[in-house]
Each structure stands twice: as C-alpha cells, then as structure tokens.
Amino acid sequence: MITRSSRLLCLSALLALTASVAVAQDALSYQTPPKALADLVTVPPTPGVSLTSKGDVMLILERASAPSIAELAQPELKLAGLRLNPANNGPSRASYITGLRLKKLPNGTEIRVKGLPDNPLISLVQWSPDETKFAFAASTQNRIELYVTDVATATATRLTNRALNATLGGAFQWTSDSKSLIAKLIPDARATAPAANAVPTGPTMQDNSSGKRGQAPTYQDLLKNPSDEKQFVHFTTSQVARLGLDGSEQPFGQPGIIATASPSPDGQFVMIETVHTPFSYLVPVYRFPVRTDVFTIGGQLVKTLNDGPLQESVPYSPDGAPSGPRDFEWRNDALASVYYTVALDKGDPKVKAEVRDRVFMLEAPFTAEPKAIYDAAFRFTGFIWGNGTTAIASERWWQTRKVITKLVNPSTNFAATVLFDRSSEDRYGNPGSPDTKPNQYGREVLNILPNNDIMLVNGQGSSPEGDRPFVSVMNLITKKITPLWRSEAPVFERPIATLDAAAGVIMTTRETPDENPNYFIRNLKKRIALIQVTSFPHPYPQLKGITKQQLRYKRADGVDLTATLYLPVGYKKSDGPLPTFVWAYPAEFKSKEAAGQAQGSPYQFNRIAAMGGAVFATMGYAVLDNASIPIVGEGQRAER
C-alpha cells in the first residue's frame, strides 16, 4: 500500500530529478574526444590542387578540417532523391574549399587570391578554356554566388548579383570563347517558398492498370505527396542565362526544372534538359520526364531533340537502361554535333540481342534525320573523342563484368576495332586510361601524338606486389604497348597530369608512410632530377612512427586475402598481443582469381583520417584496415 508520505517522497525525488536534468541540459555543450583524436580532427588537411593543361600554373585549394556546426545546422529538404538546402538552393551536404592560392610552376611564389568573400565556402572551381581565368561558386547562408578570378592579378570578382541554383548540380559552364558562362539562376519573380504541409488532402493513388510486372530498387528521399511536389518545383526551378564578363545577360527560354545547360563546343548553341510532370512517388528525379532542347546562343529555340517519358519500369539490373533516347551529349571534337544512345533491347538485359545499344548523331543546324554511327553489343558507356579520324568507344556488361574498349574511325562510318576486352574486376590487367588534353574549344579530347601514339595512365597500377602506378604508350596503328615508367619501392608515386606528352613530362605525387604527398615534375624520357613544386608538411608529425604492413593470407576456400596492418608508435613484438580493430566491408566478385588480387601499397602515406579505422592506432590499438572480405558468386546464379 502506498501511503501519502511515500507519494510525497516519490514526487520530491521526481522534481529533484527533473531539476537536475534541466540544469544538466542547460549546461551541456559539445564534448571533445581524447586529445590524440581531437588533434587529428582539427588539423587542416593537405590542400588539393588544380593545374592548367600546360602545367604552368597551379591553383592550390585549401580545405577545412571538418564542417562547422553552422554548416551542419543548415536546413535540409529530401525531395525526389535530392538532399538540398532550401536556404541557399544548393546541396545540403557538401565539402568546401576555404582558400585559394596561385603558383607559377615550377618555382614561383604562392600568391593568395584576393577578393574572396569572408569565410568563403567555395565549390565548382572551373578553368576558362583559355586558362586565363577560373570561375567558382561561393555559398552563403541564403544564396550561392558566381565569382570569376583573373589569374594574372590573382583577383576574384563577383560576376552578377543574381544567385545561382545548384540544387540539380551543373550550376554553370564556360563558353568556348572564355568571355561568358552559361548559368542556372534563381528566377527573378520567384514567389515565397511553399510551406510544407504534413496534413494529407486525400489518399495517395498509384495506378498499375497496365498490369506490368517488374522489380524495383528501394530509393531514398522520394516525393510522397502534393506538398512535396510543390516544394520540389519551387526549389529546383531555374532560369538559364548567358552571363558575359562584360556584365551582359541573355536568358534562354522560360524558367523550368533545368537538369543541364551546356554550350556547344563552338559556342553557337546551348543544349538544355528540362524535367517536367508527371512526377513519380516511386523513382527519383533522374527518372522523371525530361525534354531536350537546343537554342541558339542568342536565345532562340532551334529544335526539341527529344521529350522522354517517365521511366518507372527500367529493368532492375545494373545492365538495365531506359527504353528511349538517353544521354544527349555534345561531340567534343566537332563544332556542334549532338550524339545520344537508344537501347535496341528496350533496356532489358534479359532480352537476347546482338546489338543492345545504338548511338545516333545529329549535326547543326539539326534539320536532318539523326544518323546511326555506332552499334554496341553491350551497354554503351561513352566516347573519348579525338579528331575526325580517331575516337575511343567503351562498352560494359555488369553480369559478366566485361569491359570492351574499341578504336573508332569517325570518317569511315565509325569502323571499330577492339583495343581491350577484359574484366572490370581484373585490376592487374587494367591498361590505364588514355591521356586527354583540352582542344581549341576547351573540351577534353585524346592527346594523339604525331606518330599515332597515345599515353596510357594508370593511377592505381595494381600488381601482385601491391599498387604500383604506371605510364605506358600505345601505338594506335600497331596496338603495341610500351611501358615508360612505374612507381618503385620504397616510394608510392602516382601520375596526376601530363604536362607535355611528346617530351614525356608528367606531374606526379610522391609519398612514403612518413612523408606527406607532394607534387613533382618528372621527365619520363630524360634521366634528370625530379623537380619538387610543393612542400606540404606532415599534418600530424606527432604520429610519425606508426608502422604499416601489407598482409597477404589465404581463406579456408583458397581465396587470397589482403589487409593493411597499423601498429602504434613504439610497439615491439615483445610487448605482446594488442587489442585489434578490424575495419572492413564485403565486396562482390565473379571469380576467386579476381577476389584474390592484391590491393593497396605499404608505401603510401599513413593518412590517419578521423573517420577511418586507422585512427585507433593512435590510441594503442592494432588496426587491420581494409581487410578484404570477398563474396564470390560464380556462374549464372550470381547475375541479377
């Protein structure tokens, strides 16, 4: 039996507890981890870099150690598969550049860029085609602004008072004359944002009267009701305009949900893709209906190339594709030619077909019928354009992991010969990627040397000894591949840019377990000393001495496994066993041979990221990092 006195005692205790909780909540602030971990979180990361194509100027990109609490506290809307910030019309989750420096190579003085906004949050850095300027987006709490920097004076200037709309990405792109940019802007007459309404006005209806059956993946952050639709339309609607460096502004069409807006290589046309209704509650925005239009640079509509339907029934497979025209792109080595792909198997990998994808091309003035230029036995993944007689086409088929690379001659009805036919899982057999360079329009094309050689660059360079990046040369006539250079122990060196392919001059990063990656100029043909162009210090010298070993061992079924073992500073085997963290995630493979290939390098810098597994080595633990856990599915049953 509960007496009156006991009830009073319970009430007093409850009030005391409530008061103590309230005091604790009032006094509570964000806590800090142990100092060893806090030092890793707060140290500025090594800057990134961006180079001109000639390698004469380096842009150094400073980054913050972590986003601020103010950045993390920004609002977020999840609509149609997007996560956007309604306050500034950009992505809600982004990493930013916080400072810019310019350096003339190889030995110029670093100059800090002037004219940046206070506490800058910079993204989307993009060189002009003539490389005398670069543009970038600067985010604030309530808008995203477009800046252009003059390289000669290292001065940034805001180009327009209009705010960018970056909710769907691709907020701006230079035209080929380097005198203007095509940008997606917040419309002038945009109304107040519609308030979210969680109260339904009626049931959500879904119609499958066609009786079609099919699997569908589970997508995140889809539209759920008419209120979501209104917010989606409001925040993704843009006005495309050409912004001149002289202050001029030329709009294109009406405001709409602009997915992409890209100028032609010659700068005379602009291709715009506009998302429109009907929307879907089953698939994200990239499956919504989209209309593809071409405008003149003066803003007049030339032609609607396609108006694609809602794609709710794309076969559930990595080899599935939309059934109609898709992937409209400009041909990089032509003045104004559009190419696109159509799945002849209706996008269904279960349908047997000798030709699965057909590529079509349409040249300006876009009045003729599209011309079929390439047939792909598998899914077409793209061209690397070169010139009027040379291009490289790629195909892939996920079910078998097949990747095919073909040499194509655009001048002879796109006659094709196979260069490589390999498995995407075969890291050892990866020949590397063809070297490219910007052409006169500022578009990337194959860097073809006078003797029909091209460089092949592999920044990973997997081998039985671990990763060893390399550079080789392939002759496009004989198909012969000649190795030029490969990273050698005890250093990990990675090619990151070709400065002069004919002379064999490249830029690399070099690192060791205790030496931070820095940038060097290497001549592959002359045995001359490397030229060091950066001297980034060790970000956490207090952690020098953490040891790293590359381990190889066998699983019970005979599959070779790899892992990287980190041991604390000063640890000796005589100290006995250590508590150990295993940091791993399983991966799928089609064969035991591919699953057993080595990965990683014992000579890479000991980068102790605060969010990674290796950080526990700073606290006295052993860490088995990136331990391979292959799931091998051989045969047809492994397909989906």
Question: Would you name each region that the model predicts?
Answer:
Residues 10-20:
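Bacterial N-terminal signal peptides
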Residues 1-11:
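Bacterial N-terminal signal peptides that target proteins for export
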Residues 58, 131-135, 178-182, 267-270, ...:
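Hydrophobic beta-strand positions that form the internal "hydrophobic ladder"
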Residues 50-52, 127-128, 174-175, 264, ...:
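Structural signature of eukaryotic scaffold interfaces centered on beta-propeller domains
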Residues 24-45, 102-122, 149-168, 198-199, ...:
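Multi-bladed beta-propeller domains
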Residues 64-101, 186-241, 276, 280-360, ...:
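Predominantly five- to eight-bladed beta-propeller fold
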Residues 276-279, 325, 333-335, 353, ...:
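Serine-hydrolase catalytic core recognition
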Residues 116-124, 141-227, 313, 324-325:
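Asp-box/WD-like beta-propeller blade repeats and closely related beta-sheet repeat scaffolds
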